[in-house]
Amino acid sequence: MKFALMVSEGPYTHQASDTAWNFANAAIAKGHEVMRVFFYHDGVYNATRLTEPPQDDRHFVNRWSALKEQHNVDLVVCVAAALRRGIKDEVLAPGFRISGLGQLVDAGIKADRTVTFGD
């Protein structure tokens, strides 16, 4: 099965990012494909390399970057949501790219299921 994910909450303010990352890894481990993760609203904070969590905490940005590197998952950050929050190409972590809502629509068309994480 081919999945597309949308994450609409920040990494340290809501469980959505943690749950989405765990879902993506579990799906891949079961032989499914996660074709794209679209970060929308406060979810764009998952993509900034400026995040510096304490050493004893999860580093969501690095986790997502590793998912891209290991499984070639397309990590797309909504351009409008990113710009509203001061996130530009210069501060994106490795593996992320900025694009428009058309990428979410495209993922919804190509994927068998689109799963949303966040309120």
Regions found by a protein language model. Name each.
Residues 5-18, 46-52:
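Short, glycine-rich nucleotide/cofactor-binding loops
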Residues 6-8, 38-40, 79, 116-118:
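Short beta-strand segments
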Residues 17-32, 37:
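Histidine-anchored nucleotide/phosphate-binding helix
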Residues 24, 35-40, 74-79:
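Short internal beta-strands
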Residues 50-55, 92-94:
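Short glycine-enriched, charge-decorated loop/helix-capping segments at active-site entrances
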Residues 53-81:
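A glycine-rich helix N-cap at a beta->alpha junction
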Residues 85-116:
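C-terminal structural segments of small proteins and small subunits
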